[in-house]
Design a protein with these regions (language model features):
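Low-complexity, acidic Ser/Thr/Pro/Gly-rich terminal tails and inter-domain linkers that flank the onset
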Residues: 36-44
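Short acidic/glycine-enriched loop/turn segments that link adjacent beta-strands
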Residues: 33-36, 116
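Charged, amphipathic alpha-helical segments and their flanking helix caps
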Residues: 1-29, 43-136
Length: 136
């Protein structure tokens, strides 16, 4: 049987890395009236990407950065920079799973929300391998 990476394990690893390296909270569900700044993690896609010899999957993750309300965009730019730096370090996943690729896909959106807070979405792709295919 093949042990795959669960979404909970992936989310927990991303959350831990962001909180440890940025000093800000990261959520999967933002509590109502939560004061900014914070990050919000959303796994938006999971697809197989096997090779000839390995069992692989690719996860697409959107990380929302919510900065304090204000006229300047410097706070959101700073949050994006801290996020990018934090995720240059490899995530810690269960030991039977190998990360083959952990890369930023780019900024998907940068806008001002109705609350006056700046909101950016930065996308990442994480490709993992579960092991080698064996012919018996």
């Amino acid at each position: 049987m093949l042990k795959k990476l669960g979404l909970v394990d992936l989310h927990a690893s991303i959350k831990q890395k962001i909180e440890d390296k940025t000093g800000l909270m990261a959520y999967d569900h933002v509590p109502e009236d939560m004061p900014s700044p914070f990050y919000f993690i959303e796994v938006v896609d999971k697809r197989p990407e096997d090779t000839k010899v390995m069992w692989c999957e690719v996860f697409t993750v959107w990380i929302h950065a919510i900065a304090e309300a204000g006229k300047s965009k410097i706070a959101i730019y700073d949050m994006i920079e801290k996020l990018e730096e934090a995720l240059t370090e490899e995530l810690v996943l269960p030991e039977e799973i190998d990360i083959l690729r952990q890369s930023e896909v780019g900024m998907q959106s940068l806008q001002e929300d109705e609350t006056g807070e700046m909101h950016a979405i930065v996308a990442y792709e994480i490709k993992v391998s579960y092991g080698f295919k064996v012919k018996i």
